Amino acid sequence: MPEQSNDYRVVVFGAGGVGKSSLVLRFVKGTFRDTYIPTIEDTYRQVISCDKSVCTLQITDTTGSHQFPAMQRLSISKGHAFILVFSVTSKQSLEELGPIYKLIVQIKGSVEDIPVMLVGNKCDETQREVDTREAQAVAQEWKCAFMETSAKMNYNVKELFQELLTLETRRNMSLNIDGKRSGKQKRTDRVKGKCTLM
């Protein structure tokens, strides 16, 4: 499907095995898979409300491998918002996000007006290598938001994408999370007076 000019592009980065695909699939399809299948690059679409009209939230799930730097640079140049995922069970996965963050700053010039979320996934696991305060300190240094999630337990997954749109100050964004495409009437909640979950 070709990109539309009104697509809002979110790019998900992180090391292999941190749960990027699991977070995206949990959000878009409501499913979770236990088996690890490496991703080269997948794109998912979700209809959202944007500036009182309809646009498409396009989520690009990138490879955890460093074998495709040209794809990384292209994803960053086209991206409107970024989710940087690490596993709380792997300090190395947090450290590997540093060069990606620097590349985003290099390509975009500044991240002050760009929504960036640092996400500690697998927070349901007991064998942690990254303390919450440590990750919060990194997020503060990078001037980005931070959230812990569990794709497996469906903890903070919807909230992650809602918060990302809340951080978008250039447009008034609303997120349709109903994914079932049924004829049922959708309930609307106001979140922080700016974005709407439908």
UniProtKB/Swiss-Prot annotation:
Main location: membrane
Database matches in Pfam families: Ras (PF00071)
Keyword terms: Cell membrane, GTP-binding, Lipoprotein, Membrane, Methylation, Nucleotide-binding, Prenylation
Family: Belongs to the small GTPase superfamily. Di-Ras family.
Stretches for region Disordered: 178-198
Name of the coding gene: DIRAS1
Skewed-composition ranges (Basic and acidic residues): 178-192
One Gene Ontology CC term in the entry: plasma membrane
SMART domains: RAB, RAS, RHO
Propeptide boundaries: 196-198
Bilayer topology annotation: Lipid-anchor
NCBIfam families: small_GTP
Residues where Cysteine methyl ester is found: C195
Localization in the cell: Cell membrane
Protein's job: Displays low GTPase activity and exists predominantly in the GTP-bound form.
Residues bound to GTP: 17-22, 33-39, 61-65, 121-125, 151-152
Source species: Homo sapiens
Entry annotated with the keyword Cell membrane: yes
Lipid-attached positions, S-geranylgeranyl cysteine: C195
Molecular function GO labels: GDP binding; GTP binding; GTPase activity
Motif (Effector region): 36-44
PROSITE patterns: RAS
Tissue: Highly expressed in heart and brain.
Name used for this protein in its record: GTP-binding protein Di-Ras1
An individual GO BP term: signal transduction
